[in-house]
Amino acid sequence: MDDKANIIETFTELAPRYEEVVNAELNRFWGWSYTGFVNHLIQATPIPEKGKILDLATGTGVIPITVASNGFGVSRVHGLDITMSMLARARKKMISSNIRKEIDLVCASAMDIPYENKTFDLVTCALATHHMEVKTLLSESWRVLNEGGILSIADVGGSNLWKLPVVKFLLRIAAFVYFLFTENINRAWAEAGAVSNVRSKEEWSDLLTETGFQNIKITKLKSKYRWVPEPLVIQATKSNSGGSK
């Protein structure tokens, strides 16, 4: 099974209990609730009035639903996810919240975003970049953003020690064993494979600059334990000149 197929299978199985599981994991390692973490990202993000927003790896639609139902005045919110069952959960939540008209959902990969160049004023992504090829994610985000548009990300951040092959190997083993015992074999493979995609604050800054983003701001949030990698909130603006490398 390739990585993409395993991710889809993993989150298909996880979809009915996704928010409960992620809430428990964030609380266990970072001391955050899932709702609190997402709300922090939204509050830290300049939401463009009458703008178009794209939420990558939208999952059960928490970000689009929160933005659409809290009077931010955006024109449209789009949620993209690679897993149909996650989007099905999002649609059910949209119906119960009576906000179906404000949100569009699409099943697709953030590695190949099915929108034209310069479509959105804001692109968001929470707790998912570690399952993606980061350079491709940034390039695609740049492509679909309007000039002056904002990219806003929240996810786990690594340290420079993670670059060392032996450290990376040990982290993969630790992730595999932990999720094998707490979840299942597919989740174990997915999270072990994600270790290579975790970037440090410095690496994020370099990659954003290489892609052509400006006004880069990366904030480390507090973690429950010192030995646990800290979460990062990452924001950057698409410059009015230049282009994705």
Per-range role (PLM):
Residues M1-I47, T66:
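Conserved class I S-adenosyl-L-methionine
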Residues L54-L56, T60-D112:
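Class I SAM-dependent methyltransferase SAM/SAH-binding core
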Residues M111-V123:
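A short acidic, Gly/Pro-enriched loop at the edge of an enzyme's catalytic core
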Residues L122-K135:
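A short SAM/SAH-binding and catalytic strip from SAM-dependent methyltransferases
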Residues T136-E147:
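A short glycine-rich, Lys/Arg-flanked "PGG" loop and its adjoining helix->strand segment in the class I
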Residues G149-V156:
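Conserved beta-strand signature within the Rossmann-like core of class I S-adenosyl-L-methionine
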Residues V156-T211, I216-K224:
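C-terminal alpha-helical "lid/dimerization" subdomain adjacent to the S-adenosyl-L-methionine
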Residues T211-Q214, K220-K245:
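Core SAM-dependent methyltransferase catalytic element
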